[in-house]
């Protein structure tokens, strides 16, 4: 099986890059039956069965490479866990680095692993969307991903009809257009986190 997975948290602006890549990839292309698209979100260790089942694994994620925002880098095979753990931006990266290491320990690890990572611009805007430079990077990342999946026998074919909501691997009510259109104002919703879980003045 070929697995293409986007990881990250769409609630924290550019950290949602990986999930938005998978969302766009599925909206744009149909694939051969052996290709599995996964919205990995921040599930961490719960994703291990996808990794163990994959003969080839493609990962999309926002990665702090220390480069200009929007810069894409493609990392392969044994270097992938190192980059996921080098400059952790959130807990999901720690979790997915562990997923890869545990899959190796079980002896069920993909023959090939490729990470398409993008340098984020903004990570501290709760409820925010991708910045403009990241949206442009999604387009490039998706095409690079489709080319790779084609080489892996995934046979991407442009969709001739709109993807039905029930078929979406991402959460329909968090789809990019709707997410941006329905975001409440700063006055109505805190921009630095969920107020229900923030310390209150005594």
From Swiss-Prot:
Family matches, as CDD domains: H2MP_MemB-H2up
Keywords: Aspartyl protease, Hydrolase, Metal-binding, Nickel, Plasmid, Protease
Keyword Membrane: no
GO terms classed as biological process: protein processing
Molecular function terms from GO: aspartic-type endopeptidase activity; enzyme activator activity; metal ion binding
Residue numbers binding Ni(2+): 15, 61, 92
Cell membrane in keyword set: no
Record Pfam families: HycI
Classification via SUPFAM superfamilies: HybD-like (SSF53163)
Function per UniProt: Absolutely required for hydrogenase activity. Mediates the attachment of hydrogenase to the bacterial membrane; attachment is a requirement for enzymatic activity.
Similarity annotation: Belongs to the peptidase A31 family.
Name of this chain's protein: Hydrogenase expression/formation protein HoxM
Phylogenetic classification of the source organism: Bacteria, Pseudomonadati, Pseudomonadota, Betaproteobacteria, Burkholderiales
Gene name of this polypeptide: hoxM
């Amino acid at each position: 099986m070929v697995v293409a997975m986007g990881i990250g948290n769409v609630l924290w602006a550019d950290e949602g890059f990986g999930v938005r890549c998978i969302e766009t990839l599925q909206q744009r292309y149909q694939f051969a039956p052996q290709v599995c698209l996964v919205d990995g979100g921040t599930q961490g260790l719960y994703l291990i069965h996808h990794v163990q089942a994959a003969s080839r694994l493609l990962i999309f994620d926002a990665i702090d490479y220390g480069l200009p925002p929007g810069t894409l880098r493609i990392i392969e095979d044994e270097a992938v866990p190192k980059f996921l753990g080098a400059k952790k931006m959130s807990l999901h990266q720690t979790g997915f680095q562990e997923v890869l290491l545990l899959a190796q320990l079980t002896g069920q690890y993909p023959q090939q692993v490729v990470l398409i990572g993008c340098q984020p611009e903004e990570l501290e805007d709760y409820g925010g969307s991708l910045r403009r430079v990241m949206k442009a990077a999604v387009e490039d990342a998706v095409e690079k991903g489709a080319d790779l999946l084609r080489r892996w026998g995934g046979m991407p074919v442009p969709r001739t009809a709109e993807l039905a909501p029930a078929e979406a691997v991402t959460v329909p009510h968090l789809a990019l257009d709707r997410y941006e259109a329905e975001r409440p104002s700063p006055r109505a919703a805190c921009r630095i986190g969920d107020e229900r879980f923030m310390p209150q003045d005594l």
